[in-house]
Amino acid sequence: MYNEKIVEILQNPKNVGIIKGANAVGKACSDVCSDILKFYLMIDDGVVIEAKFKTFGGSALIAVASVTTSLLIGRTVDEILAFDTNEIIQVLGNLPNKKGYCLGLVEQALRSAVEDYYKKLEKEQQE
């Protein structure tokens, strides 16, 4: 069902966990199967310096989230907003049928994280 690359990532997913003090946290929930994806980002001077994830979801979502966090390091906030999920497919290969929703969750969770970042930044500037 899963290709070799996905199986390899599932055997040792990267960046699983929570970043204490993350200044950008984004969450997305699937209407299709109730999967939940949460990204924790540490952004310094507008650039992602650390990224982790937690999920209540299946194997495909774990692999997609793991690859995404690796791809985010070194990107600017604007680059996160413009993130193309085809980059994930380039790393993983094609996802099995009915797993494409995982890419949509990534997009939603990243937008949510950027919104959270800007809210926290605005609050910080007002203090």
Residue spans for each PLM region:
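Domain-level signature for proteins that mediate thiol-based redox and metal-cofactor handling
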Residues: M1-E127
